[in-house]
Amino acid sequence: KFPSVGDEINISRWEYFAHSMAKECGIDAAECKVVSSKDSRDVLLSKRFDRTENGKRIHMASSLTLLGLNDGDGESTGKGYLDIVDFIVANGSVDMEKELEELYRRVAFNICIGNTDDHFRNHAFLLKKDGWHLSPAYDMNPTNKYYHSLLIDGYTNESSLDVLYEAHESYMLDETTARGIIKDVTRNMRYWESMALRCGLSRSDLKNFQERIEDGMEWKCGSTLHR
């Protein structure tokens, strides 16, 4: 993925950070790295996850396709993450519980970093012998926005861990599991600055999203647990 001439921030390294941070938070994220082009620009390389070790194709489909939705469907049309939950329950693998926990963890992470370009095309599934599995997470980037492309629960797209926590039953998770996931994500997110520096960003770069990430990590329902 090549940067655009008009980019005001280092898009490649911020996306690399997002994927690296996601893994730190226990998320199955796509493998990627940053290399320098001949003109010294940072370029993000992402490893394909729809191929086997010997190059055989693994059938992949976006949630947009699998849900029979149209481009643009999302919070404005009353659609969101719970539609993906419904698909996992109806068509998922024998590891349905694991898939639901993974999705919930991804939503928590997206809230923390402000990954609000989380439309249905950015959530995909791989078809394996035992059914559909969430593909590794991909195309994640921090932003300074506070509203997601998809509804977090059945009513709002507000980027809030409290909204996500209150919706845990709709994600088919018990309270203990939901608390544990959010607690784990926020605990690991405390070290986001160190991760960003390791990913080649400067301390000056961190100011671009510092306030948004700190806001995203706020969790009133679990304040006594994760601080």
What is each stretch, according to the model?
Residues 1-227:
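Anionic ligand-binding catalytic core segments
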